[in-house]
Amino acid sequence: MTVIAETPVIQSARNTGFVWLDLTRKCQLECGHCHNGSGPDGTHGTMTAEDWTRVLNEAAAAGIPGVQFTGGEVTMHPDAPHLIKHALTLGLAVEVYSNLVHVDEDWWKLFRGEGVTLATSYYGPKDAHNEVTRRPSHAHTRANILKAVKAAIPIRVSVIVSDPADTGQAACDELKALGVKTVRVDHVRPFGRAADGQKPCTDGLCGQCGDGRASVAPDGKVSPCVFSTWLGVGNVKDAPLGAILGGPEMAQANAVIRQSVSLRPSFGCGPDSPCGPDNQPEPQPDNGECSPGFPGSSCSPRN
């Protein structure tokens, strides 16, 4: 059930510290749980290179320290390399979330650059991984994780499990044996393909959406996070990013999300995951990092 706050308290948004640039819905894979339904038939949306460049400029001007490029598959967007380089020239910290299926040398050169970190998802042994991605992708992703480690590229990996009883420990052990230092476990979220046709609702959110972070979609729509895209709070084609982040629509969306979280019972949290939808977390402190894909968080935008 979605909880609607009848009279939400509108408060000014605190300084945003992180923005997802959700570039595309195109992806080589077609993961059964993909939170935004990306796949081979997806598009890059209506945002142009100029639009994304303006968003980066506005993010830097607003004092936002870092961005994550995500999708879909970032490496399939023709303007992604230019946009990443531009973000770096602005002094923004950059994380690229990739499935690491096909990475050419130009992309490796970019990944090795100062100020760039890498993130990916992993689903376990070969058969389990390929079942999720619906493609024979396991060998490619695993090999490229190892290549990133050997190249000393900072990389974090989210182990995604669909069974609440699965701790993901075997996959974590495998990744750590490869040399990955940052490995977290998270559970599938009830959005996109994983929603099984159900309408999205706030019950599947962690409660920290929009709290110091926001997401910009391929059509320019801004939402509190990559999982809450139906809670649009503005569009960067119509208004500056900073104005949207500090606007009343974002504050109201945050209030609705907070009210939803505060009204549901707490049953604790899953393995290493502060916000799996199979758990009912208590409201997080203001400095919590329970945000999908946020560096250092267990939440993954691939879920």
Residue ranges and their predicted role:
Residues 14-18, 180, 211, 270:
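Sequence-level motif detector for i,i+2 pairs with an aromatic at +2
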Residues 109, 113-239, 243-246:
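Radical SAM enzyme [4Fe-4S]-AdoMet core and its adjacent flexible, acidic
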Residues 1-109, 113-114:
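Conserved alpha-helical substructure of the radical SAM core
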Residues 50-54, 89, 109, 143, ...:
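Polar/charged alpha-helical tracts
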Residues 25, 32, 204-207, 223, ...:
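Secreted/extracellular small peptides and ectodomain modules produced from precursors
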Residues 1-10, 15, 228-303:
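Flexible mid-to-C-terminal extensions adjoining Fe-S/redox cofactors in radical SAM and related proteins
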Residues 34, 38, 59, 136, ...:
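Alpha-helix boundary/capping residues
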Residues 20, 24-27, 199-202, 218, ...:
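Residue-level signal for mature regions of secreted extracellular proteins and peptides
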